[in-house]
């Protein structure tokens, strides 16, 4: 009688964290592998960076012309005056998340023109 993958997963789910760590160490020793090598191996990070299609626009500082920055934030986000002021006052803060590169760069240029410091991540 063989054990199914689901039975193995259920058994691991019932283990404590220390038991799982001991299991991993035993598997590393038995099979001659390390868990860290599997995480580090490959070009996954370079591949993920090349495929980035969504960007976050982060307001890092309002600068000297805070009123103009608040106006620019209102125009870009559609927020009310109070919400836009709160967002600018709480910098660094995310203005927009998950936007395409063109929109992120346009928003960055608009806010920098108003005097703000902006990052696109």
From Swiss-Prot:
Gene3D superfamilies registered for this protein in UniProt: 3.30.1390.10, Single helix bin
One MF annotation (Gene Ontology) recorded for this entry: structural constituent of ribosome
One protein family per Pfam = Ribosomal_L12
Keyword set, alphabetical order? Ribonucleoprotein, Ribosomal protein
List the GO biological process terms: translation
**Can you quote a single GO CC term?**
cytosolic large ribosomal subunit
Describe the family membership recorded for this protein in Swiss-Prot or TrEMBL. Answer: Belongs to the bacterial ribosomal protein bL12 family.
What does the subunit comment say?
Homodimer. Part of the ribosomal stalk of the 50S ribosomal subunit. Forms a multimeric L10(L12)X complex, where L10 forms an elongated spine to which 2 to 4 L12 dimers bind in a sequential fashion. Binds GTP-bound translation factors.
**NCBIfam families, alphabetically?**
L12
What does this protein's UniProt record list under function? Forms part of the ribosomal stalk which helps the ribosome interact with GTP-bound translation factors. Is thus essential for accurate translation.
Protein name per its UniProtKB record: Large ribosomal subunit protein bL12
């Amino acid at each position: 009688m063989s054990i199914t993958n689901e039975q193995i997963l259920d058994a691991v789910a019932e283990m404590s964290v220390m038991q799982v760590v001991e299991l991993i160490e035993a598997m590393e020793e038995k099979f001659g592998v390390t868990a860290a090598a599997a995480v580090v191996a490959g070009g996954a990070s370079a591949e993920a960076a090349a495929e980035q299609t969504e960007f976050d626009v982060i307001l890092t500082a309002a600068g000297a012309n805070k009123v103009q920055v608040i106006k620019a934030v209102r125009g870009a986000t559609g927020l009310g005056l109070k919400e836009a002021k709160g967002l600018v006052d709480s910098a660094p803060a995310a203005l927009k998340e998950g936007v395409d590169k063109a929109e992120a760069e346009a928003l960055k240029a608009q806010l920098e023109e108003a005097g703000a410091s902006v990052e696109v991540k």
